From Swiss-Prot:
Annotated stretches, region: Disordered: 390-420, 465-502
CDD domains registered for this protein in UniProt: 7tmA_Melanopsin
Source organism (scientific name): Gadus morhua
Function comment: Photoreceptor implicated in non-image-forming responses to light.
Subcellular location(s) of the protein: Cell membrane
Lineage: Eukaryota, Metazoa, Chordata, Craniata, Vertebrata
Tissue specificity note: Expressed in the inner nuclear layer of the retina, possibly in amacrine and ganglion cells. Expressed in a subpopulation of neurons in the dorsal habenula.
Annotated family: Belongs to the G-protein coupled receptor 1 family. Opsin subfamily.
Protein name, per record: Melanopsin-B
Extracellular side: 1-19, 78-93, 158-189, 266-279
Length: 615
């Protein structure tokens, strides 16, 4: 054995130095193994946590768990013996595992940052890139990349030797040979500094995007009265998800920065100035990176805390106190919020307006970074990609029939029945985690692509009967005529002529242009005001086309009305099972023939259609 390489050699330091190191290593091992095991256990117990963005969290927990369980016991035993006792082969395996799991954690954090970057700054691209299959492919590439760097010293590019107090092993960054210096430089660049630069760039762009979105809301002011609540909520959510991932990455970088600095000092030729303590302490700090993430989740991630409190009795104190539940259960995370969002004060009376708005809250993204699954309460829809909603500040104004239904007193609203008050329909699988939005300025839309959609909640069977254009049979007949290219159905008086009007895609001039009138079309015999053409919905054919093109992420119910939708089991809907037709829902005579189909909610319909046409 080459004694100069350090095997079996003791370092002349006081014994208590080894014992202090052993104590901290023991703490790191116990906390790292237990904490990351709880993270994995929580994700295995709660199916709703198993979303694609959360796969990165699971992968990070796995790598941290393996880091703690393979490094801490051996490090602890060697510290008690005050030397390396497992031989050269053991040193190589120990160092290989440390390099593999440490690099995996770093590159996994890079993947998390890129995921968050795409979600927040490029929503149209996110709809195509963020999926379970792609996430698994990215995770596989992360492990292969880490494996390549970890195998290099075993194959002759550098080597693994004891370090510090000779109780731990790593690659040889001290010996000044071309192979060792080349490996050290390349490893620091491609595993630490370049990923760190990319991570910093991603978070800078996310911060600027979120800040710009907030300023846009302030600038628009009252022009976005009906959508301000949704926009503010989604911006807060995206920022909270970003902060969760940012905290994880900052802690990890601080853990490995001292170690990277020590290796670069040795690479520069000043290794002789490094004492055994200056080599051992950074190594211990680096291995401690495996214990921080469980604490971050326990503090920030409410669903993680609730899951552990439910399945681990001794952790009951992690459960959140119950929240007050409003009529629409608006406090539930990752769900459609059906709430009273705007109160208009006037000299004569106060009006309440119901609008369907998308609500998300603290999670995954986890995400994720997504970090937040579907909620048990109410109809659910994950919406992480929502900053683009700022591109649509135009206030939605429905036809008079809908506006009349929106004006109620507060007492009447509290006593709303199924016929009068209905939650918005669920049209997406929650585990897909996207509500795509266009960037600003908006991209050019294809022909026959309306940018508005109706809020189906307020449409009664009587409203359907008053508007023949809404009749399902009439719509199919129009498809059989000269308008076979028409992919959409209108629930108001409007026609397809208004869909290409500038006010639909021009945010700045939307208010003024809405006062103009649109030209005549085959559906309307007279000029139609723009605000009467804001009620566009998917036809069954269009919906199924989107369903096929997007890989079946949508759930569309061709038959049955809103009453049928209400009778869906929340558990069945959350599992992503196909929605049944009206017969299997035991719908009775309260289902009018003229309402034999359900449609997407207002914002969901509009945004999904835009993203589909942009593909």
């Amino acid at each position: 054995m080459d004694m100069d390489r350090g095997f079996y050699r003791k370092v002349d330091v006081p014994d208590h130095a080894h014992y202090v190191i052993a104590f901290f290593v023991l703490i790191i091992g116990v906390v790292g193994v237990t904490g990351n095991a709880l993270v994995m256990y929580a994700f295995l117990c709660n199916k709703k946590l198993r979303t694609p963005p959360n796969y990165f969290i699971m992968n990070l927990a796995v790598s941290d768990f393996l880091m703690a369980i393979t490094q801490s016991p051996i490090f602890f035993i060697n510290s008690l013996f005050k030397e390396w006792i497992f031989g050269e082969t053991g040193c190589r395996m120990y160092a290989f595992c440390g390099a593999l799991f440490g690099i995996t954690s770093m590159i996994n954090l890079l993947a998390i940052s890129l995921d968050r970057y795409i979600v927040i700054t490029k929503p149209p691209q996110a709809i195509r890139w963020v999926s379970g299959r792609r996430t698994m492919v990215v995770i596989l590439l992360v492990w292969l990349y880490s494996l390549a760097w970890s195998l290099a010293p075993l194959l002759g590019w550098s080597s693994y030797i004891p370090e510090g107090l000779m109780t731990s092993c790593t690659w040889d960054y001290v010996t000044s040979t071309p192979a060792n210096k080349g490996y050290t430089l390349m490893l620091c660049c491609f595993v630490f500094f370049i990923p760190l630069g990319i991570i910093s760039y991603c978070y800078l762009c996310m911060f600027l995007a979120i800040r710009s979105a907030g300023r846009e809301i302030e600038r628009l002011g009252t022009q976005v009265r009906k959508s301000t609540l949704m926009q503010q909520q989604t911006i807060k959510t995206e920022w909270k998800l970003t902060k969760v991932a940012f905290v994880v990455i900052i802690v990890y970088v601080h853990s490995w920065s001292p170690y990277a600095c020590v290796t670069l000092i040795a690479w520069a030729g000043y290794g002789s100035h490094l004492s055994p303590y200056s080599k051992a302490v950074p190594a211990v700090i680096a291995k401690a990176s495996a214990i921080y993430n469980p604490f971050i989740y326990a503090i920030i991630h409410s669903k993680y805390r609730d899951t552990l409190a439910e399945h681990v009795p001794c952790l009951y104190f992690l459960r959140q106190p119950p929240r007050k539940v409003s009529m629409s259960r608006a406090q539930s995370e990752c769900s459609f919020r059906d709430s009273m969002v705007s109160r208009q004060s006037s000299a004569s009376k106060t009006k309440f307006h119901r609008v369907s708005s998308t609500s998300t809250a603290d999670t995954q993204v986890w995400s994720d970074v997504e970090l937040d699954p579907m909620n048990h309460e109410g109809q659910s829809l994950r919406t992480s990609h929502s900053l683009g909603v700022l591109g649509r500040s135009k206030e939605h104004r429905g036809p008079p029939a809908q506006q009349n239904r929106q004006t109620r007193s507060s007492d009447t609203l509290e006593q709303a029945t199924v016929a009068d008050w209905r939650p918005p329909l669920t049209a997406l699988r929650c585990d897909r985690n996207f509500l795509p939005q266009p960037t600003h300025p908006p991209y050019k839309m294809a022909a026959a692509t309306p940018l508005q959609a109706t809020t189906v909640d307020n449409v009664t069977p009587e409203h359907w009967n008053k508007h023949p254009n809404n009749n399902h049979k009439n719509h199919n007949n129009r498809h059989n005529g000269n308008n076979n290219n028409e992919e959409h159905e209108y629930s108001g008086k409007g026609g397809r002529h208004c869909q290409n009007h500038p006010h639909h895609i021009d945010v700045k001039n939307s208010i003024s242009n809405c006062k103009k009138t649109c030209e005549k079309d085959t559906f309307s015999k007279e000029p139609v005001p723009c605000n009467a053409a804001d009620d566009v919905r998917f036809s069954p054919r269009s919906a199924h086309t989107i369903q096929h093109a997007m890989g079946t992420p949508f759930r569309y119910m061709p038959e049955g009305d809103i009453a049928c939708q209400e009778r869906l089991s929340t558990d069945r809907s959350q599992r992503g099972d196909p929605l049944p037709d009206s017969k299997s829902l035991n719908c009775t005579g309260d289902v009018p023939v003229s309402a034999q189909r359900c449609s997407f909610p207002h914002e969901t319909s509009r945004n999904l259609e835009e993203s589909f046409m942009a593909l």
